[in-house]
């Protein structure tokens, strides 16, 4: 049976990340980057309180950062965010990451967020399968019992006093939000029931009953200009105003911190202007703070309690731990807690009177008192659960006191390696660095974990005031070290992740095994500080120094492109395709290896192998193979036997060892480097597909998508258009000009020279516009008046009705049938065209079954005749379907491309627009 890590260990691991320095950002001030006296005073706020608030949401960016910052920084409470999904079903406005890679990016963005609001981050196993209009659909895809169990587990681990959910009711879209809140409400009671999810109890978790559950009731207050405050009218409602008060230690309001935190959700377009005092205070629309309604409580008075604050009725003081002992607590418990509280008060007074170093003595006394009380608990005659609850919180206080003591002593600790990408068996030079900026000597020594061996001089020694010590150690990475990558992968039968069983539940990522433990003695008390071993890099011009954990990578990292190859079922010489394989040498010296493709039966790769030679570490080589299908008759027979989708794999062989693993790097200036493991595979899709020959497409890249590669697979030549080409290039040489995802938001040159595209269409060209959001509505970029809406169709299996069956999009050169609308992924499309001039013609209509999105939906595929040419808007999500290998999407795109160079027919009769 798998055992969970003790709750106290998870708490220590969560706090350990605070010792990893963060990079600077323009005009932003991460609270985690605070040092010296401000950091000390912030830490002192945590020592005499045990307040604990958990927030639950559906996706990254749903959280109220002001509330987390207020309770975490201003009040000193423990704050945690449990996010149901990692947001992998959303869009990406800064790069090409989708699906699993987007999950990694958005998880890292939350880590960047918490450098401001200070919360711990946890997740359930739920997958963001895309926008949903149905709680029932969400529960069915997630698995109600599985995700409910995840919430129960996190409540039992974190043991919050107050839980804050997101929206509970509402008939709008995004029903993941309502689902997560309803599951949280059920978990609020279930976590206290030992009969609920008994397997968790068997692994060592204890039941826990939180005291209050709130949910978001809207924005703006009763007179606010934002969304009206909502609720059932039968429970108490208050507006959270804690974010509006100025915190002199932070130098900002918590609302201002929240604005900085929220700007880290950059892939969701939230890198907006920061709030200014009196201009845009609070989370959400201007006009007021967020409202919360009490949904459930175990406190007297029930949900009608006239509370003005979330923690009204909850004793959050450290001294209040005596309540676990019942009506007559042991005198030793009361006295022990009193000594700890007094030591904290003495430390605050010392800092105020004489500065940081003056707090060392009181803090050492406080740490000693915590440890003494821990040791005495067993002899106090406490009930088992009382002892458990008190001891758990005292263990957390030990960690907090140790870290605060280091701050008071003005000791800085670092652990850095000379290589950030390592392979099994590699020696690494690690430096454990300590600087004593205080006015008293400290004793310290260091050790490394996660390595096979570590040699060097880091024995315990005295570090004098104003001195520094650099312990240089040689460590060996284990030969069979696990490759560094996300510990979650998609389940095949549900919208859930499967987690590696050795990773503690809920963690954002697997914790690095490479850790330095620094043992200090400060003021006569021992402190043990965990410092993850990091590598340093210069980043780019804007990010400066960046740090990341050490990544274990394959000796030879292998990748293959393109990821998808489209082969016409007719076969023949034109069906041969090029496959490129890139090999990166991560060994520390020269190396030679052979590269080959593993092909399905009857397929041939030419040449059979390529030899690659490397002279140094991090050198790369790319080789090309020609992939040829079997003869046409054999290819047709293979397809009939179900072989329309095949896999070609790249392998590297050296000395009898085979390497067949690569990775995708996910990193931006505001995030830490992460790897997503990728098998070097090419999916070969054999399709009954034709496309007009010799097509050249001018592509205006937007936020980053994989559509150009898909166009190349269809046989078109895709050229990325530069600003100069948009401004004065010869556009007439393109049969089609296509704008990428969100191009009108990303490309100022496209907005500036949009008239050139309309003139191109008027002269007989075909313009295809992939989906945009509301930035498209800032001017008339289409040939006639029309706007983008938030309308979407989320059911990937929704009913399809072709409105103009004779249109070449559905007939030429490929006949689009019902089969082409099957096996779509996640959705039909989003941000459909709306409020359109009658000159626009809808070509297709979707209908999905969900009550909150019923009725036919137009605007997914819209065409307008412009002069002798065409202008098309694609709300239909081909940009998502093409990288996913959806067959029908390729056939439909082939027809859209084949419109190029053909005159637009007279506009058909307008479609009734009642479905909009």
How should these model regions be labeled?
Residues 7-18:
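Bacterial N-terminal signal peptides
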Residues 192-405:
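The feature marks non-catalytic terminal segments
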Residues 417-686, 691-693:
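Long beta-sheet-rich domains in secretory-pathway and surface-associated proteins
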Residues 658-740, 771-773, 880, 898-915:
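Aromatic-Pro/Gly-enriched surface loop or interdomain linker
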Residues 742-823:
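A glycine-rich, often tryptophan-bearing local segment used as a flexible ligand/cofactor-contacting loop or short
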Residues 400-412, 547-557:
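Proline/serine/threonine-rich low-complexity linkers at boundaries of modular beta-sandwich domains
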Residues 391-395, 542, 546-587, 593-595, ...:
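Extracellular ligand-binding/catalytic regions of CAZymes and related secreted enzymes
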Residues 25-198, 219-220:
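Active-site beta-strand->loop->alpha-helix modules in alpha/beta enzyme cores, enriched
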């Amino acid at each position: 049976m798998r055992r969970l890590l003790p709750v106290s260990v998870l708490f220590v691991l969560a706090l350990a990340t605070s010792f990893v320095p963060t990079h600077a950002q323009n005009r932003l001030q991460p609270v985690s980057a605070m040092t010296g006296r401000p950091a000390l005073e912030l830490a002192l706020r945590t020592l005499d309180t045990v307040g604990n608030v958990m927030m639950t949401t559906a996706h990254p960016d749903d959280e109220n950062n002001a509330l987390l910052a207020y309770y975490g920084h201003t009040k000193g409470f423990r704050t945690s965010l449990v996010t149901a999904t990692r947001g992998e079903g959303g869009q990406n406005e800064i790069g090409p990451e989708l699906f699993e890679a987007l999950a990694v990016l958005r998880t890292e963005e939350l880590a960047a967020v918490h450098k401001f609001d200070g919360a711990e981050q946890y997740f359930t196993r739920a997958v963001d399968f895309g926008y949903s209009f149905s709680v029932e659909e969400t529960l069915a895809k997630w698995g109600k019992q599985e995700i409910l169990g995840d919430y129960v587990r996190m409540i039992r681990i974190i043991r919050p006093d107050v839980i804050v959910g997101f929206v509970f009711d509402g008939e709008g879209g995004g029903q993941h939000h309502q689902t997560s809140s309803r599951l949280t409400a059920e978990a609020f009671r279930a976590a206290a029931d030992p009969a609920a999810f008994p397997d968790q109890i068997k692994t060592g978790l204890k039941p826990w009953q939180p005291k209050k559950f709130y949910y978001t009731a809207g924005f703006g207050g009763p007179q606010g200009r934002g969304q009206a405050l909502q609720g059932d009218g039968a429970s108490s409602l208050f507006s959270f105003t804690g974010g509006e008060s100025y915190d002199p230690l932070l130098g900002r309001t918590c609302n201002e911190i929240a604005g900085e935190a929220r700007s880290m959700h950059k892939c969701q377009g939230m890198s907006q202007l920061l709030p200014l005092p009196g201009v845009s205070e609070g989370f959400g629309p201007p006009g007021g703070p967020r409202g919360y309604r009490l949904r459930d409580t175990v406190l007297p008075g029930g949900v009608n309690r006239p509370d003005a604050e979330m923690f009204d009725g909850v004793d959050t003081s450290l001294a209040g731990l005596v309540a676990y002992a019942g009506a007559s607590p042991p005198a030793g418990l009361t006295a022990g807690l009193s000594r700890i509280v007094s030591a904290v008060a003495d430390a605050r007074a010392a800092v105020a009177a004489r500065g940081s170093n003056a707090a060392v003595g009181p803090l050492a006394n406080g740490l000693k008192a915590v440890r003494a009380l821990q040791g005495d608990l067993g002899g106090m005659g406490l009930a088992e659960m009382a002892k458990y609850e008190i001891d758990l919180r005292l263990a957390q206080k030990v960690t907090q006191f140790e870290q605060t003591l280091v701050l008071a002593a003005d000791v800085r600790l670092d652990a850095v390696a000379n290589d950030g990408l390592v392979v099994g068996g590699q020696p690494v030079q690690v430096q454990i660095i300590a600087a004593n900026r205080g006015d008293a000597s400290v004793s310290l020594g260091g050790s490394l974990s996660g390595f096979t061996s570590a040699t060097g001089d880091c024995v315990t020694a005295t570090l004098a005031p104003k001195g520094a010590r650099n312990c240089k150690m040689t460590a060996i990475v284990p030969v069979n070290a696990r490759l560094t990558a996300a510990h979650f992968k998609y389940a095949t039968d549900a919208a859930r992740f499967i987690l590696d069983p050795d990773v503690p539940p809920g963690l954002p990522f697997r914790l690095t095994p490479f850790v330095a433990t620094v043992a200090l003695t400060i003021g006569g008390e021992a402190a043990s500080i965990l410092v993850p071993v990091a590598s340093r890099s210069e980043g780019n011009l804007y990010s400066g120094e960046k740090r990341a954990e050490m990544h274990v990578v394959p000796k030879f990292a292998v990748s293959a492109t393109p990821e998808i190859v489209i082969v016409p079922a007719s076969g023949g010489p034109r069906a041969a395709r090029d496959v490129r394989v890139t090999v990166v040498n991560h060994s520390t010296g020269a190396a030679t290896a052979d590269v080959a493709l593993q092909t399905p039966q009857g397929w041939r790769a030419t040449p059979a192998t390529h030899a690659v030679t490397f002279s140094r570490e991090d050198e790369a080589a790319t080789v090309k193979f020609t992939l040829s299908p079997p003869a046409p008759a054999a290819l047709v027979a293979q397809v009939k036997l179900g072989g329309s989708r095949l896999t070609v794999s790249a392998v590297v062989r050296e000395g009898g060892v085979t390497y067949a693993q690569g990775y995708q790097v996910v990193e931006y200036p505001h995030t830490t480097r992460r790897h997503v493991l990728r098998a070097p595979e090419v999916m070969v899709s054999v399709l009954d597909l034709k496309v007009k020959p010799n097509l050249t497409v001018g592509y205006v890249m937007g936020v980053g998508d994989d559509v150009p590669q898909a166009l190349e697979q269809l046989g078109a030549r895709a050229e990325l258009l530069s600003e100069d080409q948009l401004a004065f290039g010869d556009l007439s040489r393109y049969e089609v000009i296509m704008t990428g995802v969100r191009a009108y938001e990303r490309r100022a040159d496209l907005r500036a020279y949009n008239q050139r595209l309309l003139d191109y269409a008027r002269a007989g060209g075909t313009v295809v516009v992939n989906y945009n959001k509301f930035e498209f509505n800032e001017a008339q970029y289409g040939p006639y008046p029309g706007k983008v809406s938030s309308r979407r169709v989320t059911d990937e299996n929704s009913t399809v009705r072709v409105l103009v069956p004779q249109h070449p999009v559905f007939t030429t050169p490929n006949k689009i049938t019902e089969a082409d609308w099957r096996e779509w992924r996640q959705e039909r499309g989003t941000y459909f065209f709306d409020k359109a001039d009658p000159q626009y013609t809808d070509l297709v209509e979707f209908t999905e079954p969900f009550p909150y999105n019923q009725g036919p939906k137009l605007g997914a595929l819209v065409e307008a005749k412009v002069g002798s040419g065409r202008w098309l808007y694609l709300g239909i999500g081909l940009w998502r379907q093409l990288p996913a290998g959806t067959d029908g999407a390729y056939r439909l795109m082939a027809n859209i491309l084949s419109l190029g160079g053909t005159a637009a027919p007279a506009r058909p009769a307008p479609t009734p627009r009642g479905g909009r």
